[in-house]
C-alpha cells in the first residue's frame, strides 16, 4: 500500500463489520449496557484524541506495536473505565452513531438542493468521518456544529487524561515522540452548504493536501539502498518514500502543527528553521513524520549504493538550490547543497535529483541503527535525529519549500510510511 494514498475510508476489516440498521437498537450484554454513560464519555474523548485515520495504523513507540483507530478507542475505554469493549463493538457503535448523525443532518436541511448535495458528499465519507463533527463541518460547510468538550482540556494529546483518574495512562497517544499538538484543517463555511473541501476549479486538488505551493510542488521523494544480486539485477529497498498521488477535492486538508513546538529539533543559527520561517513565505513549510523501513539486509560490499531521489514540479522556469541538513540534538552535523535546472515536460517545469549519493555520515548512522537489538532503542536514537530539506530559488533566494523531517522505525510488515502536516505559527 502506498503510504501517500491513505484516505479517510475505512479499512477492509471495518467494512466487514458494517451492521444493518438493526444495530440502532441498544445491546445489553452487561448490567450497565455496552454504552453506559461512563463508557460513552470515554468513547467520545477517544474520538477527539484519535481522528479518523483510514487504513493508517498508529504506532505506540514504547511498545513497538501499531494499532488501528478502533483498537485504540477500545484500549482507551478500558484504561479509563476498567471495562472491556472490543474493536468490533467500537466499530458497530461508530456505524450506529454515523447513521443517527446522517439522519439528524438530513432532517435539518429544508432545501432539497442542499439536501441532495449533503447526501452526495456524505456518501463519500466513512462512518468514522461522519461521527467526527469536525469532518462533517469541513465536508458540508454546516456552520455552528458544536464540537464535544470533555474534562481535561481541548487538545488531542494525553494532557486530556487527568492524572490520578482510574486507568489513566501515558500509553494512550497517537505518536509517542510528538509532544506537539495537531490542529485540524480549518476551512471557512460557504453559504448554501457547498462542500468546503472543494475550492474553486482553478485551484488544483493537491494544493493544501500535499507538500507544495503555487510556485513549487514535491512530486516524489525517496531514500533507498540498492544492492547488486548478480551482474544483471539489483534489489532496491526504500528506507523512506513519498510517492506520487492523485489527490481529489474530497481528500482531507493537511492538519497543522505549531512550528514553535519543533524549533529545538532543528538548527537555530543563521539559516535555521526559525529564521527561514520568519522570512517566509509561511505556506511553504511542512512537517513530515516518517516511519522508516529498516527491514533489510545491509551488507558492507562495494555493490551497495545508498541514494536519495526527488522530483519537483513548477509552472515557472527557475534554477533551484536544494539543501539537505542532517541534524543531531538540534545541531547541524552535515549539509549537502545541490543545484538543479528545469526541464520542460508536458506543459510544466520539472526538477529531478536522481540517485544522489547519500553522505557517509548517513550510511554509518543507518548501519549503527540497524545493529541496535530493539526497535524502542532505535526510536530513542531517532528522537534526536532530524533532517531539514530546503528548496530555494537560486536567483531570488526565496524559500520555495521547506520540509522538517522527524523519524521513527516502521513495523516491518507495514513498510515505509509517512504523514504530512502544515507548519504554522498561531
UniProtKB/Swiss-Prot annotation:
Q: Name the UniProt key words of this record, in alphabetical order.
A: Acetylation, Activator, DNA-binding, Nucleus, Phosphoprotein, Transcription, Transcription regulation
List modified residues, type N-acetylmethionine. 1
Please tell me whether the keyword Membrane is annotated for this protein: no
Give the top-rank taxon of the lineage listed in the UniProt record for this protein.
Eukaryota
Q: Which intervals carry biased composition (Polar residues)? A: 1-12
Q: Kindly state one GO CC term assigned in the UniProt record.
A: TEAD-YAP complex
Q: Report residue spans for region: Disordered.
A: 1-31
Locate the region Transcriptional activation: 167-426
One of the Pfam families matching this protein, by short name: TEA
Q: Which compartments does it reside in?
A: Nucleus
Q: Does the keyword Amino-acid biosynthesis apply?
A: no
GO MF, any single term: DNA-binding transcription factor activity
Tissue note: In developing skeletal muscle and myocardium, in mitotic neuroblasts both in the brain and spinal cord. At later stages of embryogenesis expressed in several developing structures such as the olfactory system, the intestine, and the kidney.
According to its UniProt entry, the protein's GO biological process terms are: cellular response to retinoic acid; embryonic heart tube morphogenesis; heart development; hippo signaling; lateral mesoderm development; notochord development; paraxial mesoderm development; positive regulation of cell growth
Q: How is it modified after translation?
A: Lactylation by AARS1 promotes nuclear localization and stabilization of YAP1, leading to increased Hippo signaling pathway. Delactylated by SIRT1.
DNA-binding region location: 28-104
Q: What does this protein do?
A: Transcription factor which plays a key role in the Hippo signaling pathway, a pathway involved in organ size control and tumor suppression by restricting proliferation and promoting apoptosis. The core of this pathway is composed of a kinase cascade wherein MST1/MST2, in complex with its regulatory protein SAV1, phosphorylates and activates LATS1/2 in complex with its regulatory protein MOB1, which in turn phosphorylates and inactivates YAP1 oncoprotein and WWTR1/TAZ.
PANTHER family assigned to the protein according to its UniProt record, in alphabetical order: TRANSCRIPTIONAL ENHANCER FACTOR TEF RELATED (PTHR11834), TRANSCRIPTIONAL ENHANCER FACTOR TEF-1 (PTHR11834:SF4)
Protein's name in the database: Transcriptional enhancer factor TEF-1
Amino acid at each position: 500500500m502506498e503510504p501517500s494514498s491513505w484516505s479517510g475510508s475505512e479499512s477492509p476489516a471495518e467494512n466487514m463489520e458494517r451492521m444493518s440498521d438493526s444495530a440502532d437498537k441498544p445491546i445489553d450484554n452487561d448490567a450497565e449496557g455496552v454504552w453506559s454513560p461512563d463508557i460513552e464519555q470515554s468513547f467520545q474523548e477517544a474520538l477527539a484524541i484519535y481522528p479518523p485515520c483510514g487504513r493508517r495504523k498508529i504506532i505506540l513507540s514504547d511498545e513497538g506495536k501499531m494499532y488501528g483507530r478502533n483498537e485504540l478507542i477500545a484500549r482507551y475505554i478500558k484504561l479509563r473505565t476498567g471495562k472491556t469493549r472490543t474493536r468490533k463493538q467500537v466499530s458497530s457503535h461508530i456505524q450506529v452513531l454515523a447513521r443517527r448523525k446522517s439522519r439528524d443532518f438530513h432532517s435539518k436541511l429544508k432545501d432539497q438542493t442542499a439536501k441532495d448535495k449533503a447526501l452526495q458528499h456524505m456518501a463519500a465519507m466513512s462512518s468514522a468521518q461522519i461521527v467526527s463533527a469536525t469532518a462533517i463541518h469541513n465536508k458540508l460547510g454546516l456552520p455552528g456544529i458544536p464540537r464535544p468538550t470533555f474534562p481535561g482540556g481541548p487538545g488531542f494529546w494525553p494532557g486530556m487524561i487527568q492524572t490520578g483518574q482510574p486507568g489513566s495512562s501515558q500509553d494512550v497517544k497517537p505518536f509517542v515522540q510528538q509532544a506537539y499538538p495537531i490542529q485540524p484543517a480549518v476551512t471557512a463555511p460557504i453559504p448554501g452548504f457547498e462542500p468546503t473541501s472543494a475550492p474553486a476549479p482553478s485551484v488544483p486538488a493537491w494544493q493544501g493536501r500535499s507538500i507544495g505551493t503555487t510556485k513549487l510542488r514535491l512530486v516524489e521523494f525517496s531514500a533507498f539502498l540498492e544492492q547488486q544480486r548478480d551482474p544483471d539485477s539489483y534489489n532496491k529497498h526504500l528506507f523512506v518514500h513519498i510517492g506520487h498521488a492523485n489527490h481529489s477535492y474530497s481528500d482531507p486538508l493537511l492538519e497543522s502543527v505549531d512550528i514553535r513546538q519543533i524549533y529545538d529539533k532543528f538548527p537555530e543559527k543563521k539559516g535555521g528553521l526559525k529564521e527561514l520561517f520568519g522570512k517566509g513565505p509561511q505556506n511553504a513549510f511542512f512537517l513530515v513524520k516518517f516511519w522508516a523501513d529498516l527491514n533489510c539486509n545491509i551488507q558492507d560490499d562495494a555493490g551497495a549504493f545508498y541514494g536519495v531521489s526527488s522530483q519537483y514540479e513548477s509552472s515557472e522556469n527557475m534554477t533551484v538550490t536544494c539543501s539537505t541538513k542532517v541534524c543531531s540534538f538540534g545541531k547541524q552535523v552535515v549539509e549537502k547543497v545541490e543545484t538543479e535546472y528545469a526541464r520542460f515536460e508536458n506543459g510544466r517545469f520539472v526538477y529531478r535529483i536522481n540517485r544522489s549519493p547519500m553522505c557517509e555520515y548517513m550510511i554509518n548512522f543507518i548501519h549503527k541503527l540497524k545493529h541496535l537489538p530493539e526497535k524502542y532503542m532505535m526510536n530513542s536514537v531517532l528522537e534526536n535525529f532530524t533532517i531539514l530539506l530546503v528548496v530555494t530559488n537560486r536567483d531570488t533566494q526565496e524559500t520555495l519549500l521547506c520540509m522538517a523531517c522527524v523519524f521513527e522505525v516502521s513495523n516491518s510488515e507495514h513498510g515505509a510510511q509517512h504523514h504530512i502536516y502544515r507548519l504554522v505559527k498561531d
